[in-house]
Amino acid sequence: MRPVSSAEEVGALLSRSDSSGRRRRSSPVQSASPRPAGCGCGGPRRQSSFRDDVGHAASETYLVTRLTFSLLQYLGLGYRWMSQLLALTIYAILLMPGFLQVGYYYFFSSQVRRSIVYGEQPRNRLDLYIPKDINRPCPVVAFVTGGAWIIGYKAWGSLLGRRLAERGIIVACIDYRNFPQGTIGDMVSDASQGISYVCNNIASYGGDPNRIYLVGQSAGAHIAACALIEQAVKESSGQSISWSVTQIKAYFGLSGGYNMHSLVDHFHERGLNRSIFFSIMEGEESLSRYSPEIVVKQSSSQTIALLPPIVLMHGTEDYSIPSSARFLLMPSADVHLR
């Protein structure tokens, strides 16, 4: 089986889900996301001077450097870690020509709205990829990138954003705090807040608020699934919410893992030490809490009924997260595996 995470197949699945999907019932929500000033299909442009951009870049560079040294304290300088770092460096060098093309598009294209603020934390930013010509409200993808919970960044979704924007789909790439800046609870909270911003504000950028699809890849698939299920639990129990699960037309999980207990040994063998993984997941005792497969089995029928159709895709030759980890068993839920 070949991987099915290409922009073409995601776009096709979105169209299929849109044409055959059931009507979602709406739910009143209490908006907690700031709404952008202005309106119009093109959406408000982020007003910033060159000085502001330089200052923002400098602060992010300092933050990344500081967190890198903090991370090295966790990782140590073992042979396995160093060998994998060397392999990753060589891999990045070989892909540099492609990176340069994507980087040029990311920084200079008028279709990209970079670093839109959705919350108060330093990494609470998202990028929007807008189609050139918007004649009517566009379908929307809220994308949570992967990165082993450590190196995720919103720009990793730039190629997906570009390809889907060419097909008339608005893409919102949501950034979130990585470890050691934050743990899994912070990541899920950030992702949920980013989704809230998309649900409450995307119409101002030409998006259709009734056609929002949540997509996560690798660690991002795990984080997005946690955010979705956590929101369903809150909504079914009558808690105050800033966005409704019923606003999500479908969830697509690409190469994700949904039972953290089953992945501890695998990650350890791949170089992610158990102690580091437990620190990311807020302790071994929290693995069940952040395992979507376990949470849904313990959830009420009211919670399950709120969840949108779910499509899980995984390549059988994926060694980062084994394809067996894709099984997210949900009684009475609309789940498709590919």
Swiss-Prot record:
Active site (UniProt): S218, D318
Primary subcellular site in the record, as a coarse category: endoplasmic reticulum
Cystine pairs: none
GO molecular function, one term: prenylcysteine methylesterase activity
PANTHER family for the chain: AB HYDROLASE SUPERFAMILY PROTEIN C4A8.06C, KYNURENINE FORMAMIDASE
Function: Catalyzes the demethylation of isoprenylcysteine methylesters.
Name the record gives this protein: Probable isoprenylcysteine alpha-carbonyl methylesterase ICMEL2
Organism for this UniProt entry: Oryza sativa subsp. japonica (Rice)
